UniProtKB/Swiss-Prot annotation:
Residues 108-165 bind DNA. Disruption phenotype: No visible phenotype under normal growth conditions, but mutant plants exhibit hypersensitivity to heat stress. This is NAC domain-containing protein 74. InterPro entries: NAC-dom, NAC_dom_sf. It comes from Oryza sativa subsp. japonica (Rice). The NAC domain includes a DNA binding domain and a dimerization domain. Residues 413-427 have a biased composition (Basic and acidic residues). Residues 9-159 form the NAC domain. It holds the Pfam family NAM. Keywords: Activator, Cell membrane, DNA-binding, Membrane, Nucleus, Stress response, Transcription, Transcription regulation, Transmembrane, Transmembrane helix, Unfolded protein response.
């Protein structure tokens, strides 16, 4: 060993093994207990020494600030898998993702990157010392029962371009730990210069490592560093827990900068619910809308079912209606007749609450006491119809619903039938012939009610042609009979 330490190597010679060589040759033999030629890599308890004291313990002289050591894994817990990486002056903190080392298509080990911090978490100060830990793959240990992962191979690197206080200190106020089950990234075994290896840092700005041959390699910046192994997990989780976290507020302020979010959170008025103005009334400053309603609308709201105030003041039943004597006009007026003298609900009167009353007469009303349905009453009905057509949409909807219920039509038909039967019984002269004539005339009227003038002309022409044909046929028959009589005589 002393010979290697005292040996002066010529320029260009050095110890620059690849990652695959460190695991497959040196670390695997160390775990198997096999002898390594020259024993270039010493065994040192790295976690009990400060990083600046380790270069003196290396047996191979080097000028590239890279030193290799075997270290026994000091478990933080007796039955755990976490290593205790704390020293007297500071601690080694893991950063970046674990990367798989492959030889061909087979994974032979894992590479972990750590950075030394002075002090104690979470106020540790980042330093220029970097360590790469090489682990043998677990499947290699399972394949060989005599193998144990009791050793790791460590490579210590010191960065010469490190400037303390130039944005290199770790921001401990917002740690972003790396989960332990993160999938490792793969490092290819084919590297142009195995000595020029990337260095993973926590800072957003890339860092470079100066090599002796002038080759500089850009650092790979890690987005999610993992917590130090010697940090209490419960304390670290308590620091991450925010009892005032609001997911809706966080989503709403996702697009805002930190300064804008601080202003939003400090503004108490911005958190209060926004009160929208109600523009439902015509005037924004007036709450009551009764001043903007017509008298008809107010009455329709209080007393739904009618739109004519004059008819309410002077009900229609005060003016009994006399039927017309002719059949053609009497049918229409008969259907419109609806007296309202008896408003008591009964089994035969189911619509007493809607203003329609069914009334049965046992005696014939004298003609002298029945005024004609014309004049003032007819004018009032016309005014009511006009008001119904020009009233508010709400009144029109009520009228349409009332008519669509079907009760008015049914009542009108029953009333017309009752009146006709009452008139026949009161007269004491049942006239079947008159009823049949009325039915025949009503059928003819209904058949030709929808005919237009052109259809009437066609009907008249067809009737005239039929009449002429009948007359001609009759004359022909008479002439034929007269000729036969002459022949017989």
């Amino acid at each position: 060993m002393e010979s290697l330490r005292d040996m002066v190597l010529p320029p260009g010679f050095g110890f620059h093994p690849k990652d695959t060589e460190l695991i497959s040759h040196y670390l695997k033999k160390k775990i198997h207990g096999q002898k390594i030629e020259y024993e270039i890599i010493p065994e040192v308890d790295i976690y009990k020494h400060e990083p600046w004291d380790l270069p003196a313990k290396c047996d191979v002289p080097t000028q590239d600030n890279k030193w290799h050591f075997f270290a026994a894994r000091d478990r933080k817990y007796p039955n755990g898998s976490r290593s205790n990486r704390a020293t007297v002056a500071g601690y080694w903190k893991s950063t970046g993702k674990d990367r798989a080392i492959k030889m061909g298509k087979q994974t032979i080990g894992t590479k972990k990157t750590l950075v030394f911090h002075e002090g104690r978490p979470p106020t540790g100060r980042r330093t220029e010392w970097i360590m790469h830990e090489y682990y043998i793959d677990e499947r290699e240990c399972q394949a060989c029962p005599d193998m144990k992962d009791a050793y790791v191979l460590c490579r210590i690197t010191k960065r010469n371009d490190w400037i303390p206080g130039n944005g290199n200190e770790l921001d401990n106020s917002d740690p972003h730990p790396e989960p332990y089950d993160a999938p490792p990234s793969v490092i290819s075994t084919e590297q142009l210069n195995p000595a020029a290896e990337p260095v993973v840092g926590v800072e957003a700005a890339p860092v470079t490592v100066a090599e002796p041959d002038g080759v500089t390699t850009s650092a790979i910046t890690a987005n999610i560093p993992s917590p130090s192994d010697d940090i209490n997990l419960d304390d670290w989780l308590n620091e991450l827990f925010d009892p005032f976290f609001d997911p809706e507020q966080s989503l709403a302020s996702a697009d805002l900068s930190p300064d804008e979010q601080n202003v939003e959170s400090s503004n108490v008025g911005a958190l209060a619910p926004k009160v929208e103005q109600d523009y439902s009334s015509p005037n924004e400053n007036v709450v009551d809308d009764t001043e903007y309603l017509l008298p008809e609308d107010v009455y329709n709201i209080l007393h739904p079912g009618t739109d004519d105030f004059n008819m309410l003041q002077n009900p229609l039943d005060q003016y009994p209606i006399q039927y017309a004597t002719d059949v053609w006009s009497g049918i229409q007026k008969e259907e419109l007749w609806s007296p309202q003298a008896n408003a008591e609900p009964s089994q035969s009167n189911e619509a007493a609450d809607n203003g329609i009353i069914r009334r049965y007469r046992s005696m014939k009303t004298p003609e002298t006491s029945v005024p004609q349905f014309k004049g003032k009453t007819q004018a009032k009905m016309r005014v009511g119809i006009n008001k119904m057509a020009t009233s508010s949409s709400e009144s029109i909807n009520q009228t349409i619903k009332f008519e669509n219920s079907g009760r008015l039509v049914e009542h009108q038909k029953n009333q017309a039938h009752d009146v006709a039967s009452t008139k026949r019984s009161d007269a004491g002269k049942p006239s079947t012939e008159l009823s049949s004539n009325r039915g025949f005339l009503r059928g003819i009227r209904n058949a030709f009610a929808g005919c237009s003038d052109a259809r009437w002309n066609m009907i008249l022409v067809a009737g005239f042609a039929i009449g002429v044909a009948v007359v001609a046929l009759h004359i022909g028959q008479r002439l034929g009979l007269s000729q036969r009589d002459q022949q017989h005589t």
